[in-house]
Amino acid sequence: MAEEGDVLTNLDADPAGGNGADTQPIAGILQQYVKDLSVENPKAPESFQWNEQPQMDVQFNISARKINEEVSEIELKISVHSKTAQGTVYIVELAYCGLVGMRNMTDEHKHAFTYAEAPRILFPFARRVIGDAVRDAGFAPLLLDPIDFNGIYLQQLQQRGEQSFAGAPAGEA
């Protein structure tokens, strides 16, 4: 039995049912942290005088790493490149992570929580870190638009299903 207060194994504060069984599915964020943050302001101070509206290129990626049977690290990578015809205004790259605990869940539900729900929970905090980094670099804070992680997740599942179906011989399900 986990010791009281062990956040990596004791995911719920409620004691198990009267028979001692712990069968309720549970998932949650145990810890959040900045794993890596890079800010480049390569053309300062000249870039502060540029009047042209910069073009923004925002990329994101989600990865997961299993720590143990109940805990995974979810990494949300966000890269922001701001450019004008005169050159790069700034570049911000962030790896924002969360330790996620999941217990008594099917693999399908764990996968959905890992790649849709956990990033949705982490994103507002990552967005704040990026906004603060851009502001601290001397520019107006950048407020990234919300991302529909669930919609993207469902779209990718559908694409994978279509690819699997396209590769199957006729007459097979």
Where are these regions (language model features)?
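N-terminal intrinsically disordered, cationic/polar leader segments
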Residues: 2-121, 125-173
